[in-house]
UniProtKB/Swiss-Prot annotation:
Residues 25-52 form a propeptide. One of its GO terms (cellular component) is extracellular region. Disulfide bonds join C54-C67, C61-C72, C66-C79. Expressed by the venom gland. It is found in: Secreted. The presence of a 'disulfide through disulfide knot' structurally defines this protein as a knottin. InterPro entries: Huwentoxin-1 (IPR011696), Huwentoxin_CS1 (IPR013140). Residues 1-24 form the signal peptide. Keywords: Disulfide bond, Ion channel impairing toxin, Knottin, Secreted, Signal, Toxin. This is U3-theraphotoxin-Hhn1a 18. Its main location: secreted. One of its GO terms (molecular function) is ion channel inhibitor activity. Pfam families: Toxin_12.
Amino acid sequence: MVNTKASMFLTFAGLVLLFVVCYASESEEKEFPKEMLSSIFAVDNDFKQEERDCAGYMRECKEKLCCSGYVCSSRWKWCVLPAPWRR
């Protein structure tokens, strides 16, 4: 019968070997995660906030008019979505 200590040692050695093989294959593709993260978190010029003539959602509407689709809240002076109870 197989000894429990030997069985545990073989299992541990197998896991270490599996880790080494996976690490070796990943080291070849080491740049891939960096490229993926940089492409996800890259700031695109299209998504940067632009200075507009109108105020967007939840922006102050004291000096600027609200953009189309929003109305200026008389209570808070923010641009909000129009609703029947906000007339």
